[in-house]
């Protein structure tokens, strides 16, 4: 069997045997809202207790609270969920949509293309098993979350988001876990608890969007805006030469496990319609598309043959399937195309290049631009959000911030205001490839021209020298852009510019971008962002290895790296790792210094006359943790450090020592040259 068939067979096995995928020592919990059917799923990471040895031989047990984190996986992380990809996820938002009484079920699909696909018996083996009738706004009604928000209505979706964004931080005990720096938010409203009213006001103002098509009731409400947690999008989708429906469903599930807040289906191969149906029905997160890709397939890949009628039918087709947001390159105008002539890499956006070719071949303005108001009317009937594509984005750092890029940005600013006339939620897409020193001006210009509509960027990549590592080169720029105010980051995988990403590439891209987004949340001063960092740092200092792994973004990889060099069970509780060994772990030394100073303080107290005559039961020996708050004297610390200095010199002044197979240092028999660092299977001349 070929590797191509093996991959597809593996994906088929995965989705047919799909069970909830839980992270180690994590629990799915639900936070309740104001109504019984408003239950917000979160992931709670349980921690072990910290054990403090007291000088009298007793052990103090300190309880470490569970840490609540944002969970994108929906039913895929719920052990009580009944998962069947052939039936799709539970339509838990259906009742919220119906109770508003502003939508109606259609007798059948409206798109001519969908009608043709349904009439083709040859597609039965690919078709989703549980197709439902589509829903649309009643005549004269608008059903967008922005429409409700502007009328002062707080929807269940808005309340759900407020609970989700707060991550139950009000229950975190004050102390070491809640300490944080003030942060620099660059004008964003960061710091106060998120309320449902705040969510409503931000959506009404256009500073945030809630991408939720009325035909995607399986999706859990989430929000994109610079005054909320930074979100991450993952791209999946088949191509004309690779991938299958099974593989794309597998990537969808995998994406939500590793933190994708939204997923874009960028399929360009055969069976785009069928693939998308499977993805939407099984997605707990909003799904985005680039409709021009499918429209191009309908005209056999000839850009010049595209027209408004084909594109409009594609929008209706996808809206009735449940696509939550469309990327539309309506800002690519005929007069902007010549501006790219002197670029090093020209027009690199697929959608942008398609529309540029159409404009030149017809010598007319883009039909996307000319029919933009009709696009808005259609989106308002299904609550499809718009993501205004940056077709003129730079494809290399040499082309960053040029005339074409910023001319299009100004046009996108004009279009977002038109969309708001129709109460259509809108975000703006951004670059691309931008060196670090040119990133901030992108955010500043976007805020200026687009009236604070949410910004959504692909990175940007900060250097072009690392094919195969562009999740690193772009993660740097993504963290910066998000700090300055970007609301959502589109991930880049190691395969960027090289090929279609597989399952492992999706994970690597998401981990890189979750790091970037989280780093930006901390830098902005988001009140709950640093709790997880503090919990992990405390676990690291206390050598609670399992808690270190489990609090991280990727517990499996962290555990595997540790166990490569110290696989023994004893190493799981050891107060050192293979980096420094038991003698020179800086955190272990610090603990010993604190314990020594605390012991000296206790002895000094006992030596005092009043205490010497007192009943010993009246004397409480404080723990290192308690002593830390009182702080040792400079003399105590100096004495302890001098003792450690003597120990270091007596052991040969070597920074590192070899570790035998049991993981225990044996310095007495170590005759190694001090200029060679030795750890298992590693030898570095130093």
Swiss-Prot record:
<comment type="function">
    <text>Catalyzes the synthesis of the hydroxymethylpyrimidine phosphate (HMP-P) moiety of thiamine from aminoimidazole ribotide (AIR) in a radical S-adenosyl-L-methionine (SAM)-dependent reaction.</text>
</comment>
<dbReference type="GO" id="GO:0009228">
    <property type="term" value="P:thiamine biosynthetic process"/>
</dbReference>
<dbReference type="InterPro" id="IPR002817">
    <property type="entry name" value="ThiC/BzaA/B"/>
</dbReference>
<comment type="subunit">
    <text>Homodimer.</text>
</comment>
<keyword id="KW-0479">Metal-binding</keyword>
<keyword id="KW-0411">Iron-sulfur</keyword>
<feature type="binding site">
    <location>
        <position position="235"/>
    </location>
    <ligand>
        <name>substrate</name>
    </ligand>
</feature>
<dbReference type="InterPro" id="IPR037509">
    <property type="entry name" value="ThiC"/>
</dbReference>
<feature type="binding site">
    <location>
        <position position="293"/>
    </location>
    <ligand>
        <name>substrate</name>
    </ligand>
</feature>
<feature type="binding site">
    <location>
        <position position="585"/>
    </location>
    <ligand>
        <name>[4Fe-4S] cluster</name>
    </ligand>
</feature>
<dbReference type="GO" id="GO:0051539">
    <property type="term" value="F:4 iron, 4 sulfur cluster binding"/>
</dbReference>
<feature type="binding site">
    <location>
        <position position="264"/>
    </location>
    <ligand>
        <name>substrate</name>
    </ligand>
</feature>
<feature type="binding site">
    <location>
        <position position="433"/>
    </location>
    <ligand>
        <name>Zn(2+)</name>
    </ligand>
</feature>
<dbReference type="GO" id="GO:0008270">
    <property type="term" value="F:zinc ion binding"/>
</dbReference>
<keyword id="KW-0004">4Fe-4S</keyword>
<dbReference type="GO" id="GO:0009229">
    <property type="term" value="P:thiamine diphosphate biosynthetic process"/>
</dbReference>
<feature type="binding site">
    <location>
        <position position="497"/>
    </location>
    <ligand>
        <name>Zn(2+)</name>
    </ligand>
</feature>
<comment type="similarity">
    <text>Belongs to the ThiC family.</text>
</comment>
<keyword id="KW-0408">Iron</keyword>
<feature type="binding site">
    <location>
        <position position="580"/>
    </location>
    <ligand>
        <name>[4Fe-4S] cluster</name>
    </ligand>
</feature>
<keyword id="KW-0862">Zinc</keyword>
<feature type="binding site">
    <location>
        <begin position="390"/>
        <end position="393"/>
    </location>
    <ligand>
        <name>substrate</name>
    </ligand>
</feature>
<feature type="region of interest" description="Disordered">
    <location>
        <begin position="659"/>
        <end position="686"/>
    </location>
</feature>
<keyword id="KW-0456">Lyase</keyword>
<feature type="binding site">
    <location>
        <begin position="349"/>
        <end position="351"/>
    </location>
    <ligand>
        <name>substrate</name>
    </ligand>
</feature>
<protein>
    <recommendedName>
        <fullName>Phosphomethylpyrimidine synthase</fullName>
        <ecNumber>4.1.99.17</ecNumber>
    </recommendedName>
</protein>
<dbReference type="Pfam" id="PF01964">
    <property type="entry name" value="ThiC_Rad_SAM"/>
</dbReference>
<comment type="pathway">
    <text>Cofactor biosynthesis; thiamine diphosphate biosynthesis.</text>
</comment>
<feature type="binding site">
    <location>
        <position position="577"/>
    </location>
    <ligand>
        <name>[4Fe-4S] cluster</name>
    </ligand>
</feature>
<dbReference type="InterPro" id="IPR038521">
    <property type="entry name" value="ThiC/Bza_core_dom"/>
</dbReference>
<feature type="binding site">
    <location>
        <position position="456"/>
    </location>
    <ligand>
        <name>substrate</name>
    </ligand>
</feature>
<keyword id="KW-0949">S-adenosyl-L-methionine</keyword>
<keyword id="KW-0784">Thiamine biosynthesis</keyword>
<feature type="binding site">
    <location>
        <position position="429"/>
    </location>
    <ligand>
        <name>substrate</name>
    </ligand>
</feature>
<dbReference type="InterPro" id="IPR025747">
    <property type="entry name" value="ThiC-associated_dom"/>
</dbReference>
<dbReference type="GO" id="GO:0005829">
    <property type="term" value="C:cytosol"/>
</dbReference>
<dbReference type="GO" id="GO:0016830">
    <property type="term" value="F:carbon-carbon lyase activity"/>
</dbReference>
<feature type="binding site">
    <location>
        <position position="329"/>
    </location>
    <ligand>
        <name>substrate</name>
    </ligand>
</feature>
<dbReference type="Pfam" id="PF13667">
    <property type="entry name" value="ThiC-associated"/>
</dbReference>
């Amino acid at each position: 069997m070929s590797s191509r068939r093996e991959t597809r067979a593996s994906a088929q096995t995965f989705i047919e045997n799909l069970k909830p995928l839980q992270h180690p020592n994590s629990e799915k919990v639900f936070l309740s809202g104001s109504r019984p059917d408003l239950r917000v799923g979160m992931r709670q990471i349980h921690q072990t207790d910290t054990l403090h040895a007291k000088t009298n031989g007793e052990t103090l047990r300190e309880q470490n609270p569970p840490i609540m984190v944002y969970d994108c996986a929906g039913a895929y992380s719920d052990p009580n969920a009944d998962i069947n990809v052939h039936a799709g996820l539970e339509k838990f938002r259906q009742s919220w949509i119906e109770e508003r009484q502003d939508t109606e079920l259609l007798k059948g699909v409206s798109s001519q293309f969908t009608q043709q696909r349904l009439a083709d018996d040859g597609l039965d083996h690919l078709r989703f098993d549980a197709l439902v009738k589509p829903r649309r706004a009643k005549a004269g009604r608008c059903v967008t979350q922005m429409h409700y928000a502007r009328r002062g209505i707080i929807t269940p979706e808005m309340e759900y988001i407020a609970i989700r964004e707060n991550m139950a931080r009000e229950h975190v005990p004050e102390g070491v876990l809640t300490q944080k720096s003030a942060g620099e938010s660059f004008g964003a409203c960061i710091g106060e608890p998120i309320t449902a009213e705040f969510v409503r006001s931000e959506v009404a103002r256009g500073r945030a969007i809630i991408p939720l098509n009325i035909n995607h009731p399986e999706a859990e409400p989430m929000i994109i805006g610079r005054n909320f947690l930074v979100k991450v999008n993952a791209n999946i989708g088949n191509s004309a030469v690779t991938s299958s429906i099974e593989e794309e469903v597998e990537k969808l599930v995998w994406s939500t496990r590793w933190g994708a807040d939204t997923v874009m289906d960028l399929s360009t191969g055969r069976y785009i319609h069928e693939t998308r149906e499977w993805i939407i029905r099984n997605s707990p997160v909003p799904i985005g598309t680039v409709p021009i890709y499918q429209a191009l397939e309908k005209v056999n890949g000839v850009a010049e043959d595209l027209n408004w009628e084909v594109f409009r039918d594609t929008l209706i087709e996808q809206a009735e399937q449940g696509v939550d947001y469309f990327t539309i390159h309506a800002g690519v105008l005929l007069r902007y195309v010549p501006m790219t002539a002197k670029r090093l890499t020209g027009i690199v956006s697929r959608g942008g290049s398609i529309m540029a070719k159409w404009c030149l071949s017809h010598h007319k303005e883009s039909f996307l631009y000319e029919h933009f108001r009709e696009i808005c009317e259609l989106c308002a009937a299904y609550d499809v959000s718009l993501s205004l594509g940056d077709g003129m984005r730079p494809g290399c750092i040499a082309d960053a911030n040029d005339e074409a890029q910023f001319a299009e940005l100004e046009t996108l600013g004009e279009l977002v205001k038109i969309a708001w006339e129709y109460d259509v939620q809108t975000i703006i897409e951004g670059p691309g490839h931008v060196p670090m020193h040119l990133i901030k001006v992108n955010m500043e210009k976007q805020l200026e021209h687009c009236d604070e509509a949410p910004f959504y960027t692909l990175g940007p990549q900060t250097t072009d020298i690392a094919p195969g590592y562009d999740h690193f080169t772009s993660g740097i720029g993504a963290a910066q852009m998000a700090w300055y105010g970007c609301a959502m980051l589109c991930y880049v995988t190691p395969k960027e510019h090289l090929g279609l990403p597989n399952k492992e590439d999706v994970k690597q891209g998401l981990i890189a971008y979750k790091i970037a987004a989280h780093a930006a949340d901390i830098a902005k001063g988001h009140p709950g962002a640093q709790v997880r960092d503090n919990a992990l740092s405390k676990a690291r200092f206390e050598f609670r290895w399992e808690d270190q792994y489990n609090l991280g973004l990727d517990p499996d990889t962290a555990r595997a790296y540790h166990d490569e060099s110290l696989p023994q069970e004893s190493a799981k509780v050891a107060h050192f790792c293979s980096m420094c060994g038991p003698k020179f772990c800086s955190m272990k030394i610090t603990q010993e210094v604190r314990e020594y100073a605390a012991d000296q303080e206790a002895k000094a107290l006992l030596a005092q006359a009043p205490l010497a005559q007192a009943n010993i039961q009246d004397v409480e020996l404080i723990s290192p943790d308690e002593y830390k708050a009182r702080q040792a004297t400079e003399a105590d610390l100096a004495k302890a450090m001098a003792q450690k200095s003597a120990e270091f010199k007596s052991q040969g002044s070597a920074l590192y020592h070899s570790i035998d197979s049991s993981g225990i240092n044996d310095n007495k028999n170590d005759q190694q040259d001090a200029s060679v660092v030795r750890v298992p299977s590693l030898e570095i001349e130093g």
